């Protein structure tokens, strides 16, 4: 993974921990960072067993991927979350340590625009106990990612009570940054 970054002219500094950074919450706690600064590297697939099309989503730790939005962004009829075995076979890494780069095969990469709200984000570095800091613009280049809105849109309680309002992810045009999901 470090070599993959070096091939693109970027030096990354891997930070390791004794404790797990397997989940976004664990990583944020270990780093003393905001949950939104943690890059979740999530593998999705489309197609059948013989022709799986893998998609890697780089998602802010506060967001969840909306499958319908992801399918629409990718121009696919449907997508589903890859199994742990599929993710390992497609990337060469186990869930909880999947980095945004350095996979055993080329993947289509979609990046959550909410990551751009931060000066630096933290991505997995190949192990559930290792991460690396990277500016979002550099991450996009390293991963050869397309930036697209793939986060869920949720219903939040109305401040007045009773009725609910639709809350878009922070990156949606005209929406405040407080509307992200966890």
What is the meaning of each model-derived region?
Residues 1-182:
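Extended, low-hydrophobicity, polar/charged segments
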